[in-house]
């Protein structure tokens, strides 16, 4: 049986001939509007298991090594994860977004400037400083003082869209000011290794797609520049 759009107010799109909930549609549109030079790179994976779908893709840009995104969805949930890795040589942070709609009443929105250097204190003037419960996120270690974390319902996700646009526009300004051109991906080794250990959805992925596929996604796609623990 095909996946149905759970609630029409969230928007729908079609994949493999079936409609599915597109909870983060306006966030993805904002990404394309603010960074219009993002160009499709490759499709890494397209999976279906236990009624859950996954798409993993990369995009490139004159000043970005890659923007790698993964979308995971089923009848009840819709998750969008993306990290933008800037080209090197200008000491710029990555820009990460974890947009996680697990079910109608449990949605977690996170976006931030994520610096690849360990214990590097990074902040942006004019943006809010987060003072709540960090849980997974260690402020000052690959996460900035401006990390944005919100919990809401599915009907409330667009209430945070303007702030998302503000953060992403600040990031675009950094790219345009510095115009990085380096492609030394070794600069992201520590960052990806740290993120691999931190990954909050690995258990969810294993439950849906099995351990082997889940580990491949994490090590070969999400955090491919990291060191695999032995």
Write out the residue ranges for each language-model feature:
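Surface-exposed polar/charged interaction patches
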Residues: 37, 41, 170, 174-181, ...
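Histidine (H) residue identity feature
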Residues: 8, 13, 61-63, 115, ...
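N-terminal amphipathic/basic-hydrophobic helices that include classical n-h-c signal peptides
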Residues: 1-19
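Alpha-helical oligomerization segments
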Residues: 181-230
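Short Lys/Arg-enriched alpha/beta "domain-start" segment
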Residues: 17-95
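Extended, non-transmembrane interaction/recognition domains
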Residues: 81-180, 184-186, 193
């Amino acid at each position: 049986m095909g996946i149905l759009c759970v609630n029409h107010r969230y928007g729908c799109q079609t994949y493999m001939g079936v409609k599915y909930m597109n909870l983060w549609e306006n966030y993805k549109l904002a990404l394309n509007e603010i960074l219009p030079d993002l160009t499709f790179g490759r499709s890494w994976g397209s999976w279906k298991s236990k009624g859950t779908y996954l798409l993993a893709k990369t995009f490139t840009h004159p000043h970005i090594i890659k923007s790698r995104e993964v979308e995971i969805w089923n009848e009840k949930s819709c998750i969008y994860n993306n990290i933008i890795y800037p080209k090197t040589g200008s000491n710029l942070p990555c820009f990460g977004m974890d947009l996680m709609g697990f079910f109608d009443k449990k949605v977690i929105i996170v976006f931030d400037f994520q610096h690849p250097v360990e214990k590097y204190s990074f902040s942006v003037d004019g943006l809010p400083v987060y003072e709540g419960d960090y849980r997974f996120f260690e402020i000052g270690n690959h996460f900035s003082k401006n990390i944005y974390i919100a919990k809401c319902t599915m009907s409330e996700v667009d209430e945070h869209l303007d702030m998302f646009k503000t953060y992403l526009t600040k990031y675009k300004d950094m790219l345009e000011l510095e115009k990085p051109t380096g492609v030394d991906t070794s600069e992201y080794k520590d960052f990806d290794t740290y993120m691999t250990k931190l990954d909050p959805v690995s258990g969810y992925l294993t439950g849906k797609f099995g351990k082997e596929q889940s580990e491949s996604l994490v090590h070969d796609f999400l955090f491919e520049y990291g060191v695999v623990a032995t």
